[in-house]
């Protein structure tokens, strides 16, 4: 009996020791497939942002082109025909918005902050180019858009900005990107090729893309009168200067993967 009691006491003691030593359970493990805002690296965020920006672009093209096709029907139609009488299904018009804001834009401030701290200037440049591209896509589709308070700091109630604010902001992002691509990376930073699935880490291709987008966006201001693009005016001289530094052949193209 004494032996039996001793065995029980030993078992209880062992269990108490086991559980007291495991108060944090498996907190020591970090799941590389599910990074958090705190431990996600700037290079991993870039690949994620590129994927979602690419998807937002595809959905924008798909939704708009299919809608146009359904609008040509005389009666009835598929999923998108209801858009012709202004009664669209929610998913038909919000998917590009969701993929851009929820998948890409929300990650950009974190990438810029971490890359800046690490002096990974080329990552900052890529993030700025994508930010300009994504928000210009959104304002082309939807008009006025949450811009200045639309990302991580906005929460669930972002405010809307007008087209001029968005245009000038996107052009400023491209100017910043061009500056960043011309800076020398910090000695301990990850190569741009580690996280870049669009240009394979080619800074030259990123620069050409930035100049091309800048020329394209300034050209859209043709009805705003001649002047400086910095003031939201049509700036023909700047367009031509940017085109001289943009892609000159297919070998210079950015490929969205």
What are these regions (language model features)?
Residues 9, 51-58, 113, 186, ...:
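Generic surface-pattern signal
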């Amino acid at each position: 009996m004494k032996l039996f009691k001793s065995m029980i006491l030993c078992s209880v003691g062992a269990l108490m020791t086991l559980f007291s030593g495991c108060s944090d359970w498996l907190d020591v493990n970090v799941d590389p497939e599910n990074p958090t805002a705190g431990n996600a690296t700037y290079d991993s965020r870039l690949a994620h942002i590129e994927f979602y920006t690419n998807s937002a672009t595809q959905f924008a093209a798909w939704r708009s082109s299919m809608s146009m096709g359904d609008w040509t029907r005389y009666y009835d139609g598929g999923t998108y025909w209801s858009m012709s009488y202004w009664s669209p299904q929610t998913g038909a018009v919000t998917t590009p918005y969701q993929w851009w804001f929820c998948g890409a834009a929300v990650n950009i401030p974190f990438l810029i902050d971490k890359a800046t701290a690490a002096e990974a200037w080329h990552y900052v440049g890529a993030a700025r180019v994508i930010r300009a591209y994504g928000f210009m896509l959104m304002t082309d589709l939807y008009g006025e858009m949450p811009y200045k308070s639309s990302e991580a700091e906005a929460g669930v109630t972002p405010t809307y900005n007008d087209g001029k604010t968005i245009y000038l902001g996107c052009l400023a992002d491209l100017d910043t990107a061009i500056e960043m691509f011309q800076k020398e990376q910090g000695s301990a930073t990850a190569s741009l090729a580690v996280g870049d699935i669009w240009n394979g880490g080619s800074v030259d291709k990123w620069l050409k893309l930035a100049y091309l987008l800048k020329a394209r966006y300034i050209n859209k201001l043709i009805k705003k009168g001649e002047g400086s693009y910095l003031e939201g005016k049509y700036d023909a001289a700047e367009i031509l200067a940017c085109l001289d530094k943009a892609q000159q052949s297919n070998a210079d193209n950015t490929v969205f993967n």
